[in-house]
């Protein structure tokens, strides 16, 4: 997304308070615990600590807890939201990042309790209020899920 040849400085780490300043999500739907690195207009690396105390593990699945794929994608989307809001200087403005499309999603390995899920998201392009991203979730160096999605930056719906 960067339109100049200037070197953009990395931001990070960012704690959960800074994440919450960029996102409207709260427990139990806040799925980004911290940001390790954010390069405005380019990429973000964030972390979701997946614990057995996650509410979704109660029913998904009893005796064999696995993080639902849709929530892995949601965690990636939230990381993208932080990237977009921080990159555009919109933190604290109340602007929201809404999903518009999810494409090319693949789930490679299950996400179980007790791991740190690494969320890597890159800007592919931005035009006006529309942003496209490429993302992947990793467990150590193994890809658990990958996807591309489109989102829109807008004011909250009333």
UniProtKB/Swiss-Prot annotation:
GO terms for cellular component: cytoplasm; membrane. The keyword Hydrolase does not apply. Its EC number is 4.2.1.59. One of its GO terms (molecular function) is (3R)-hydroxyacyl-[acyl-carrier-protein] dehydratase activity. InterPro entries: FabA_FabZ, FabZ, HotDog_dom_sf. Disulfide bonds: none annotated. The keyword Translocase does not apply. It holds the Pfam family FabA. It catalyses: a (3R)-hydroxyacyl-[ACP] = a (2E)-enoyl-[ACP] + H2O. Its main location: cytoplasm. One of its GO terms (biological process) is fatty acid biosynthetic process. It is found in: Cytoplasm. Keywords: Cytoplasm, Lipid A biosynthesis, Lipid biosynthesis, Lipid metabolism, Lyase. It is an enzyme of class 4 (lyase). The active site is at residue 60. It comes from the Bacteria. Belongs to the thioester dehydratase family. FabZ subfamily. Involved in unsaturated fatty acids biosynthesis. Catalyzes the dehydration of short chain beta-hydroxyacyl-ACPs and long chain saturated and unsaturated beta-hydroxyacyl-ACPs. HAMAP family: FabZ. This is 3-hydroxyacyl-[acyl-carrier-protein] dehydratase FabZ. The lineage of its organism: Bacteria, Pseudomonadati, Pseudomonadota, Alphaproteobacteria, Sphingomonadales. The gene is fabZ.
């Amino acid at each position: 997304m960067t339109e100049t040849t200037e070197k953009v400085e990395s931001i990070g780490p960012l704690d959960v308070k800074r994440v919450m300043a960029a996102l409207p999500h709260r427990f139990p739907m806040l799925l980004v615990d911290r940001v390790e690195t954010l390069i405005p207009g380019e990429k973000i690396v964030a972390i979701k600590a997946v614990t057995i105390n996650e509410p979704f593990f109660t029913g998904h699945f009893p005796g064999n807890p696995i993080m639902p794929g849709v929530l892995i994608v949601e965690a990636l989307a939230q990381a993208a939201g932080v990237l977009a809001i921080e990159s555009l200087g919109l933190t604290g403005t109340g602007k929201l990042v809404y999903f518009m499309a999810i494409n090319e999603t693949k789930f490679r390995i299950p996400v179980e309790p007790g791991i740190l899920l690494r969320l890597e998201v890159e800007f592919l392009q931005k035009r006006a209020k529309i942003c496209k991203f490429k993302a992947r979730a990793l467990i150590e160096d193994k890809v658990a899920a990958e996807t591309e999605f489109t989102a829109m930056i807008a004011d909250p719906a009333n």
